[in-house]
Structure formats: C-alpha cells, structure tokens
Amino acid sequence: ICGHAGLITNDLKIKDEIKTGIWFTDFYINKKYRSFGYGKLLTQAWMKICPIQVTLCNDASLKIFKKLDWSSNNKFLRKLEIFNYLNLIPIFKNNNISNVIKENLKIKEINNQTVSNIANESEKLLSQKSFGVVRDENWFKWRVLECPYKKNMLIFNYEGIDIITNLKVKYNFKILNIIYTSRPINLNLTKVFSSFIRKNKINFISYISKNEKILNVSLPWSKKLNFAFNSSDSTIKDSINEDFND
C-alpha cells in the first residue's frame, strides 16, 4: 500500500440548481513513494468520480491540486480559544459535564425529532440563498445520529440558533469542537456559551470561521486553511470561489 484517499459526496445548491460534489476528506502518500507521482495519479482518479471537487488541505496536497488546475483561497480559519487557564493544570481538572447553564442556552436531546427540526430550519435558510451546502434530514442523520462519536456530541440552542458540537479529549485536554451552527454566532452567544465551557472546565473551543484578517498569517490559535476546489465548468468554479462560505 503506497497511500490512501477518502471522500464524502455532498449536494450543493449552485445558482438555484442542485449539483453533486465530492469533499476530499483524507489524502496520504507514504513518504518513500512521494517522488513517483502517485499523489497526482490518485487525485486524477478522484476527479473522475464527480465533476465538482472541494477540500480543506495542507500545503503539500495543495501543490498537487494546483498542478491539476485547481483553484484555492484562504477564506477560512481554524480557531482555537483557551477558556480555562487554571484547568490546564492537572490537579484542577474536572471531567464531569454540568447541565447548569444560563437560562437562554439549552442542551437538546439527541434524537430524530431534534435532528428533523434542525434540518427543517437548515432547508429554510438555504432556500433564501443562491449558493450553499445542502444539509437536509439525511445529512443531519448521517452527521449526528449515525456518527460513531455520537456519545460525545452535544446539541445546544440559544434563542433559535442551533449549535452542534463534539467534545473531544486530546492529550488529556477537553476540546469542544463546533461542527455546525444554523446562523453566525454573535458576541452575546459567545459570552453565554463561554459560561457553559468554564463551568464544565473545558480547556479549548475549536471552530472554523471566515478569514477577515488583512495579513494572511497562521498563528497557533488561528490557523489559515487552504480551501481548494475544482470543476470542469468554469462558471461553477467561479461561483464556489465567490460564494462558498458555509
């Protein structure tokens, strides 16, 4: 085995039409085979599956994609915020999750009804856009109910905003990863959400946001992401570059 690749199919709404694209999720070539051009061959095989391809990738993968006429931008950032400096010290750690949260922030049960309600709201919001990722009921069932890490998920609602999160433990630190919000998180929500994180002694909160920095520089707590994409249709390619923001 010299390498492997993974992908997920996902419908996209582009100029009010539903198109199927593939999201490249995993791309690896064994170091001793990287000079043989296998990365390029693997990507070319990938590209035959579907005419629209998108991914978030590292610099090494981006070099391969660009050789095949892909486009890219850095409009997204992976952000990591520290919320419990004291809890970084092992003696102060607490692994219990408390349901004591501010009145307007609610934890919802993870079941079919919750997922169905979130999906309905997502489809309503998408109907108001000319471009976006199609997240219907099947998408949310796959992403939440069928997820192998379902037991680590928490779904919040704050004044009508749904927030799907995954609680991970890495190097003995608790990280709350935000994987979906129905609408942008405003400052007030950030404050309320932070209160829950502090009460439960979660060390970090991780999320992807728009890159609004003037200088395109990565920092330990704010890493620029390579968003790469390709399509045989140049108008679709332009639309992804201009309108893809969720």
What are these model-predicted stretches?
Residues 1, 6, 71-179:
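Amide-forming acyltransferase catalytic core, primarily the GNAT-like/NAT-type
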Residues 18-31, 172-184:
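Conserved acetyl-CoA binding element of GNAT-fold acetyltransferases
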Residues 9, 53-103, 163-246:
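Active-site/acyl-donor-binding loops of N-acyltransferases
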